[in-house]
Amino acid sequence: MGDKTRVQVSKLKPGRYILIDDEPCRIANITVSSPGKHGSAKARIEAVGIFDGKVRSIVKPTSAEVDVPIIDKKTGQIIAITPDTVQLMDMETYDLFDVPIATGVNEEIKDKLKEGINVEYWETLGRIKIMKLKGESS
C-alpha cells in the first residue's frame, strides 16, 4: 500500500498506470518517435489523473525508467454518507475510514451511493478513491 515500482518506458502500454508529477495516472496514449541518426527513440505518454482527472503528458527516452504506482483494489461497504465524506468499512480488515466526496468518488457513481452497498475502492500512495458499485443490499 502506497508503494511504487520502476518500469522501463518501452514496456508501458495504454490502460496501465504511471506516476506523473507524483500523481497516479492512467495511460491514454503512447506515441514513439523513431530514433534519428544520433539519438534514441522517444516516447510521448499522455495520461489522465486518477484522482483529479487532469490530462498530463511527458516525453521520455524509451530506455528510461519511470515510476509506476502499485494500486490495491479492495471491496468496502458504505457505512455513512455525510455532505463532504463517505465512511467506508474494508470488507477484509473491517477498518473504518473516511473518503472525501470531492476527490475520492468516481463522478459516474456519485448519485448512486447509498448506505449499506458494497463498492470497489482503489488505494495507492496513501490516497483512496471509490471506483464502482459492487452490488446493492436490500
Curated annotation (Swiss-Prot):
<dbReference type="InterPro" id="IPR014722">
    <property type="entry name" value="Rib_uL2_dom2"/>
</dbReference>
<dbReference type="InterPro" id="IPR012340">
    <property type="entry name" value="NA-bd_OB-fold"/>
</dbReference>
<keyword id="KW-0963">Cytoplasm</keyword>
<dbReference type="GO" id="GO:0045901">
    <property type="term" value="P:positive regulation of translational elongation"/>
</dbReference>
<keyword id="KW-0396">Initiation factor</keyword>
<dbReference type="InterPro" id="IPR008991">
    <property type="entry name" value="Translation_prot_SH3-like_sf"/>
</dbReference>
<dbReference type="Pfam" id="PF01287">
    <property type="entry name" value="eIF-5a"/>
</dbReference>
<dbReference type="GO" id="GO:0005737">
    <property type="term" value="C:cytoplasm"/>
</dbReference>
<dbReference type="InterPro" id="IPR020189">
    <property type="entry name" value="Transl_elong_IF5A_C"/>
</dbReference>
<feature type="modified residue" description="Hypusine">
    <location>
        <position position="37"/>
    </location>
</feature>
<dbReference type="GO" id="GO:0045905">
    <property type="term" value="P:positive regulation of translational termination"/>
</dbReference>
<dbReference type="GO" id="GO:0003723">
    <property type="term" value="F:RNA binding"/>
</dbReference>
<dbReference type="InterPro" id="IPR001884">
    <property type="entry name" value="IF5A-like"/>
</dbReference>
<protein>
    <recommendedName>
        <fullName>Translation initiation factor 5A</fullName>
    </recommendedName>
</protein>
<keyword id="KW-0385">Hypusine</keyword>
<dbReference type="InterPro" id="IPR048670">
    <property type="entry name" value="IF5A-like_N"/>
</dbReference>
<dbReference type="GO" id="GO:0003746">
    <property type="term" value="F:translation elongation factor activity"/>
</dbReference>
<comment type="similarity">
    <text>Belongs to the eIF-5A family.</text>
</comment>
<dbReference type="GO" id="GO:0003743">
    <property type="term" value="F:translation initiation factor activity"/>
</dbReference>
<dbReference type="InterPro" id="IPR022847">
    <property type="entry name" value="Transl_elong_IF5A_arc"/>
</dbReference>
<dbReference type="GO" id="GO:0043022">
    <property type="term" value="F:ribosome binding"/>
</dbReference>
<keyword id="KW-0648">Protein biosynthesis</keyword>
<dbReference type="InterPro" id="IPR019769">
    <property type="entry name" value="Trans_elong_IF5A_hypusine_site"/>
</dbReference>
<dbReference type="Pfam" id="PF21485">
    <property type="entry name" value="IF5A-like_N"/>
</dbReference>
<comment type="function">
    <text>Functions by promoting the formation of the first peptide bond.</text>
</comment>
